[in-house]
A protein has these predicted regions:
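Coil residues (strongly favoring Ser/Thr
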Residues: 7, 64, 79, 376, ...
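Flexible, acidic glycine-rich loops studded with aromatic residues
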Residues: 383-388, 393-398, 404-553, 558
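Feature activates predominantly on carbohydrate-active enzymes
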Residues: 105-330, 371, 375, 475-479
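Contiguous, structured surface segment used for ligand recognition
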Residues: 21-170, 488, 504-526, 530
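Active-site neighborhood of glycoside hydrolase catalytic domains
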Residues: 295, 299-397, 403-411
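Bacterial Sec-dependent N-terminal signal peptides
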Residues: 1-29
Length: 784
């Protein structure tokens, strides 16, 4: 590395925390050491530190460096209170922070050097982006409170002496936000961009059109927003939102100022119901049904008609308005999950296949993609599509975004096409669970831990060595089906997006997950300054003799039991047994707790900053065995009654009188119909099944179900009413004698949170408290 300073002297002085007047000088543990994320390519720590004071000038060489200097001076003023002078200068000066751009720097496009000593700091970027990232690194050398939007009383604002040479491993470091399933405001978008740029993520993939909503103004087609941006939810309420073109420009500029390039996505030829509901003539059969913006998740069978030339004129018109709003090189056209059933029926599509000499509907999709590619080429844009664009042949210059595992990315790279890796199997679908589904907010499925995201390597061994340069990077996808609020979106995104940032920036040999966990403690405090609702691992209960969690908030026992806790990564657990709320100073959990009486144990995880996770209250109820009843002549199954009506939850049919009686063999049959992914098939009804369940032996039993309600021995036992009950989060236990026990089960056919209950598996599962495995309640266990 070039030497920017001759001497690095004096003793290292770290930041001290003072959160309130009078100023404290207590050393904050999370501010100890070097806490840069992502870990730089090369870092050498020197002796001493540079003290940032109100008199520290920011000197900049050249106009671009001056703009960046002003940006960071304003940011530093908010937390330090210092009005740091910003001046143009052709050379460094003692006591200053000097910024410059040097295109001859022997680093990649976004590379930078940073050197600090007690005499001063110099940050050199090969480009403006490199200089910006160097200054983000400088902020991470300061105490975490530097991210505060308001004045913080600190004993010292010190920058440790370091020599850093850094550049990213990959050029594409991305994060996807889905504003179609659930909308993000302009301010939400700006905050997310701020957070991405802090950790050197340089691409924001903006998913703007979907079956569930069209979110961008198109002046030539006003119904796309007056109709296509709105849907009627399962509870009858309207949900909507869209961005005007002026708002798009505002967000794009905001991102550009922070060196984040926005990649827009306009979905075609599938995922198009937002457009089709607005203009039905875009589909193969405009008069077959009443088209509405989809209010359930999943994929619509109706897609853009590939046989009509008017469809391509619509696509051209949309691109003519959208492309100029986004100056980046990439434009995403989707291309995924496009059902071919309508094309097979459509005479226009079949004529297109014949006229163009195409083999089948897969090649018809490829035809659509190639035409979109040519439209984008007029603007000098590179087309990106999901890996389904490989079907039927790949457009010549297309970049593949590989999401269905790595197979598509491997195939495309070995063919010589550029690839962006984003496989769910690699942990990069960060809308997936990151903890026990029994206690975490509902998610679509699956399990993506922080360590799994961090450990992902975007270059699979199956790519031949001379084709590996085609892997341009990786992206974390934040699909929003179950992200009902902005805080919930943040909870899914962070800290996993931070793990992705290091996975795609830091050289493979420099990655160290344990050290990343240490540095993350500092990053958490930075997120706190931005009021981010990030995920803190919750205390979970493992199944007996297992590491698999199946947490339980109501534990019935007859003699004694125990409470064993674990977290998805090392973090201190605190608890109380007197009913009080835990604090950072509460008793630390070190070993299983012995429980011999009825009580409530409250548990939480606590970070080094003192911040607590959500508190879990676990009720322990010492019970006598609930007696069984005698059935003289049990008849297999459950008696049912069914009522059709505008029902949303169990409370809605309390006064219903239009019941039809029947019998079912299992609880699975309480769901009378199976929805085949079409919102028009949804039937609003309630089904109640009553009878008895046979318990095989005395003991405490845990029950789990996604049904709306389960009554046991005449009492409401499990209540999922009104929830998106995709994965049971209300498991409960009861001490039961062997034999028959009265039960009632309630199923309500409705759409809640975009999830139709007709997609539920309405089985009931049970296990003994001491067992590690659930079993399904079978027909042999039910009678009336």
């Amino acid at each position: 590395m070039n030497k920017l300073f001759v001497s690095l002297a004096c003793a290292l002085s770290l930041g001290y925390l003072a959160t309130a007047a009078p100023m404290k000088t207590t050393l904050a543990s999370y501010n100890q050491g070097i806490n840069i994320i992502p870990q730089p390519k090369e870092l050498v720590q020197g002796k001493g530190s540079f003290a940032l004071t109100a008199k520290t000038p920011l000197l900049a060489q050249g106009d671009s460096a001056y703009i960046i200097a002003r940006f960071f001076a304003e940011k530093l003023q908010r937390s330090t209170g210092y009005q740091l002078p910003v001046r143009s200068s052709s050379s460094a000066q003692p006591g200053a922070i000097y910024l410059r751009i040097d295109p001859s720097l022997q680093l990649g496009h976004e590379g930078y050097q940073l050197k600090s000593s007690p005499r001063g700091v110099e940050v050199v970027g090969r480009t403006g982006a490199g200089l910006y990232y160097g200054m983000q690194t400088l902020l991470q050398l300061l105490p975490a409170e530097v991210e505060s939007p308001s004045l913080v009383k600190m004993a010292r604002w010190n920058i440790p002496a370091v020599t850093i040479e850094d550049e990213p491993r990959f050029e594409y470091r991305g994060a996807l936000v889905d504003v179609c399933r659930h909308f993000l405001t302009v301010e939400d978008m700006k905050q997310h961009i701020d957070l991405l740029s802090m950790f050197k993520i340089n691409r924001l993939h903006w998913h703007l059109t979907e079956d569930q909503g069209w979110r961008i103004e198109i002046k030539k087609y006003p119904r796309l927003t007056s109709v296509g941006s709105k849907r009627i939810e399962g509870d009858g309420k309207e949900y909507g939102g869209y961005y005007t073109q002026e708002q798009i420009k505002e967000i794009v500029k905001y991102a550009s100022d922070r060196f984040v390039t926005i990649v827009p996505e306009i979905e075609l030829p599938g995922h198009a119901m937002g457009a089709i509901a607005s203009y039905p003539e875009l589909t193969c059969f405009p008069y077959r049904r009443v088209y509405q913006v989809r209010n359930i998740w999943g994929v619509e069978q109706d897609v853009f008609c590939a046989g009509k030339e008017s469809t391509f004129q619509f696509i051209q018109d949309v691109l003519d308005e959208v492309v100029p709003l986004f100056p980046g090189q990439y434009f995403h056209i989707g291309g995924d999950e496009c059902p071919k059933i309508r094309w097979k029926e459509c005479p226009n599509c079949q004529k297109r296949i014949k006229d163009e000499g195409l083999k089948d509907e897969h090649e018809l999709q490829s035809y659509v993609i190639r035409r979109a590619e040519k439209m984008l080429a007029k603007y000098g844009k590179k087309l990106i599509g999901w890996d389904e664009i490989l079907e039927g042949g790949l457009a010549p210059t297309a970049t593949v975004m590989s999401w269905q595992g790595e197979k598509g990315g491997i195939q495309a790279a070995n063919m010589g096409h550029d690839v962006i890796m984003t496989p769910g199997s690699g942990g990069l679908y960060i809308d997936h669970y990151q903890g026990d589904s029994k206690i975490e907010p509902v998610a679509i499925c699956c399990y993506s831990t922080l360590e799994k995201v961090y450990s992902y390597n975007p270059i699979p061994e199956a790519i031949v060595p001379d084709k590996r340069h085609h892997i341009k990077g990786a992206q974390a996808n934040l699909w929003a089906e179950y992200l009902y609020t902005t805080p919930l979106m943040q909870y899914r995104a962070f800290p996993r997006e931070i793990a992705l940032a290091e996975a795609v920036w830091t050289p493979l040999e420099k990655k160290n997950y344990k050290d990343f966990e240490r540095r993350l403690d500092n990053a958490y405090v930075r997120l706190d300054q931005h009021k981010v609702n990030y995920h803190i691992p919750l205390p979970e209960q493992p199944l007996p003799g297992s590491r698999q969690s199946a947490s339980l908030s109501y534990v019935a026992f007859t003699d004694t039991t125990s409470l064993t806790l674990q977290t998805t990564r090392p973090i201190r657990i605190v608890y109380t047994t007197d009913g009080s709320e835990p604090t950072a100073k509460s008793q630390t959990y070190t070993q299983p707790l012995h429980i011999s009486k009825s009580q409530v144990v409250k548990v939480a995880s606590v970070l080094p900053s003192g911040k607590l996770s959500r508190v879990r209250a676990i009720t322990f109820d010492k019970q006598s065995l609930s007696p069984a009843v005698e059935l003289a002549t049990p008849t297999p199954g459950l008696r049912t009654k069914t009522s059709v009506g505008n029902y949303y939850s169990a409370a809605d049919f309390a006064s219903a009188t239009n019941w039809t009686e029947g019998v079912v063999k299992t609880t699975q049959e309480l769901r009378p119909d199976r929805l085949n992914n079409h919102m028009d098939e949804i039937k609003r009804k309630a089904v109640v099944g009553e009878g008895y369940i046979k318990i095989p032996a005395d003991g405490s039993y845990v029950f789990s179900t996604n049904l709306d309600q389960m009554y046991l021995d005449g009492e409401l036992f499990i209540d999922n009413s009104g929830e998106t009950s995709k994965f049971s989060r209300h498991d409960k236990s009861r001490a039961l004698k062997a034999g028959w026990h009265r039960v009632k089960f309630v199923f309500v056919g409705a759409v809640r949170g975009g999830f139709p209950t007709y997609w539920e598996d309405t089985k009931v599962e049970y296990r003994k408290l001491e067992d590690a495995k659930f079993s399904t309640v079978t027909a042999e266990m039910l009678a009336y």
